[in-house]
């Protein structure tokens, strides 16, 4: 998979915003799924969730999946990676994972 890491801070900001939107959409759907007049809005949010999950599960390699699934889908924050990766390896792999994730979402 080809990836570009020209601007790591922009990639990090975009992925963080996607993670926040993903968490919001999941909560929104759970909260309002029983209200019938909200069904179009819920379906739209479900499509966005499916896109994020589909990219994560289907298009990312194992290393990218590990980081994106933990930070975007599970919403882990802080030093969650310390039991798995060294800090320098994590930051290097995270930059690559973010770039690949954003690239896949653009497709």
Residue ranges and their predicted role:
Residues 1-58:
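N-terminal interaction/assembly modules
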Residues 11-15, 70, 79-82:
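Alpha-helical interaction segments
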Residues 58-59, 84:
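Short, conserved sequence motifs enriched in acidic/basic residues, glycine, and aromatics
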Residues 59-75:
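Short amphipathic alpha helix immediately N-terminal
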Residues 74-88:
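Helix-turn-helix DNA-binding module
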Residues 90-105:
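DNA major-groove recognition helices of helix-turn-helix
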